[in-house]
Amino acid sequence: MNKQSTQKLPHVTTRRLHDMKSEGEKISMLTAYDYTTARILDRAGVDVILVGDSASNVFAGHNTTLPITIDQMIYHARAVVRGVQAETSRAMVVIDMPFMSYQLSSEEALRNAGKIMKENECDAVKIEGGNVIVDTVKRITDVGIPVMGHLGLIPQSIYKFGSYKVRAREEQEAEELLRDAKLLEEAGAFALVLEKIPADLAAEVTASISIPTIGIGAGGACDGQVLVINDMLGLSTEFHPRFVRRYAELDRVIFDAVSRYVDDVRGGTFPGEDESY
C-alpha cells in the first residue's frame, strides 16, 4: 500500500477479517479517539480502528474506563469515522460499549448498540465479558449489528478483580475462558480481543475457534494485535507495561517542540517576517 495515498480502497469488513485468519494474514488494530489520528491510522494501513473506552483514561484522565458515557463514546466515534472517510475509507471502525450500557438487560444493550450504530457510521461494537453476556451478544447480532467480544483482563470489571494482573493462569479460569470463547463464537461474535492472558492459552483459543483473535498482552499466536495508540507512541510516560512496544517517544518530541515555541514567543523571535502579512 502507498502510505501517502488517499485513494479509496476496499473497506475492511467482518468477512475480510475472517479471510485474513484463514489465510494466515495478521490483523493490525489500534485505538483512536479523534479525527486527525484516525486519518493517519487509516492512511498507514491499520486494518481496524478501535474507538476504545480507554479514552476515559488517556483522553479524559480518569483512573479507569468506567466514567465514560455512551454519548461521549459516540462523540469520539463520529470524529474517528470522519477521519477514516477523509482518507482511504479502508479501516473498519469498532466502538467499545461503555460500562453499564449493556449489563442491565439484553434489550437495553440492543437499544444502546442501535443508538451507537445509528448516530455514526461505525462498523461494529465491542463488548467485554464471557458467559454472562452471551445472550446479549446473540440478541445484538441477531438484528444485524456486528459484535466483537473481549475476554481475559476486562478493564470494566477492574473493581471486581482488584488488579490488572495477567488472567487465566490457573487451570479452572483458563478452561472457563476457552469455553467462553466458544460460546461467544456460537452467539455470533465476529472476533475476540484476548487481553493479558498466557500466550499458550491464547494460542489454544485461537486454534479452537473460527473467528479471529486480537491479542493485547496475549502472545504472538493470536490472529492480530491491538495497542492503545498513546502507549505505542510513547505519549503515556507513566504507563509502560511489558506487552507494549513503543514505536516513538512523542512525549519528548512534543515537549521539546512546545519548549522551543515558548522560548521563541518570549524571546520575540516568533512570529518573524516569514510568518507575518
Curated annotation (Swiss-Prot):
Magnesium is among the record's keywords? yes
Going by the entry's taxonomy, the superkingdom of the source organism is recorded as: Bacteria
User: According to its UniProt record, which reaction does this protein catalyse?
Assistant: 3-methyl-2-oxobutanoate + (6R)-5,10-methylene-5,6,7,8-tetrahydrofolate + H2O = 2-dehydropantoate + (6S)-5,6,7,8-tetrahydrofolate
Cellular component annotations (GO), alphabetically ordered: cytoplasm
Q: Which residues form the active site?
A: E195 (proton acceptor)
List the CDD domains: KPHMT-like (cd06557)
Q: Could you say which enzyme class this protein belongs to? A: transferase
Q: InterPro entries in the record, alphabetically? A: Pantoate_hydroxy_MeTrfase, Pyrv/PenolPyrv_kinase-like_dom, Pyrv_kinase-like_dom_sf
Give one Pfam hit by family name.
Pantoate_transf
The record's subcellular locations are:
Cytoplasm
* Cofactor(s) demanded: Mg(2+)
Where do the annotations place 3-methyl-2-oxobutanoate binding? D53, S54, D96, K126
Subunit annotation: Homodecamer; pentamer of dimers.
Q: Which PANTHER family match?
A: 3-METHYL-2-OXOBUTANOATE HYDROXYMETHYLTRANSFERASE
Q: Which family does it belong to?
A: Belongs to the PanB family.
Main function: Catalyzes the reversible reaction in which hydroxymethyl group from 5,10-methylenetetrahydrofolate is transferred onto alpha-ketoisovalerate to form ketopantoate.
Would you tell me the protein name for this molecule?
3-methyl-2-oxobutanoate hydroxymethyltransferase
List the gene name: panB
